[in-house]
Amino acid sequence: MMKGYAGALLRKSRLYRRITEWDWTAFGLARSALEKHAGRPLEGARVLDLGCGPRFPALLLFHTFGARATGIDTEVVDPAFGEGAGLRMIRRHGFARFLKSLARGVLFDRGYYRELRRRAERPLLFRGLDIRRMDARALDFPDAHFYLVHSNSVLEHLEDVPRALYELARTLKPGGVASVVIHLFPSLSGGHLLEWAYPDEDLPRAAPPWDHLLENRFPASVPLNRWRERDFRRELEKRFELVEVERYREGERYLTPERERALSAWSREELTTRAFRALLRRR
């Protein structure tokens, strides 16, 4: 099990520049949205990173650039990963999870953070990070608390999206903004297989394109709600004004006429749209 995981990490380590580029871009878009549409500088603003993840890149950047930022996730790796953090993780998530986190730190995270620091052009501020274990369906924050809510590739993993959006809207200040990126399930990378994370990269691949929509011989190791863009937009528009929508494309060269016929339940637009970003204001 660990051998396969280490091999996946080694492949992923070759992609950390791409992953960092995506995370840096998402941070920059959220920062610009706050300044342009809420009229506030990032420094000193209360910011929520919804689903900050084990590397917490957006939270780290918000904190480094002076925001009063909080990150939440259902499972969080201690920023100061060491002996004490390892013991806490073993108690909380088990020894296998601890080994995976340790391997990720050695094989991937160091290079990732070096690249993130290069893009930020300043030291990354790990000290004082506010990371909390919390369910997006029950945010333990007051009403109208945050000027900015950021979420990058999180909502596609949630079972109860409407409840999470209710909580997001509740905790967002009037006049505040949310910057939400959603990775779409029908896309080529939507099955969350590491080998298809970046389809334009030349990597060895066992799964055929869009296998997750057909035979699904390589099921995702993370929960996916399988929503389509129209499902997300329907729920977003109930609680927010959509100020901007931007789409990111991928996979055109893999969508042969034969594959398109096999995937006729989805439109070409759905199959070749990796993700969309919505800039939101609370209604």
Predicted ranges, named:
Residues 224, 230-283:
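A C-terminal cap/extension of S-adenosyl-L-methionine-dependent methyltransferases
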Residues 57-138:
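Class I SAM-dependent methyltransferase SAM/SAH-binding core
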Residues 43-53, 70, 177-208:
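Conserved class I S-adenosyl-L-methionine
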Residues 134-149:
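A short acidic, Gly/Pro-enriched loop at the edge of an enzyme's catalytic core
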Residues 186, 215-231:
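Acceptor-substrate binding/catalytic loop of class I
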Residues 23-44:
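Conserved alpha-helix/loop element of class I SAM-dependent methyltransferases that forms part
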Residues 162-177:
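A short glycine-rich, Lys/Arg-flanked "PGG" loop and its adjoining helix->strand segment in the class I
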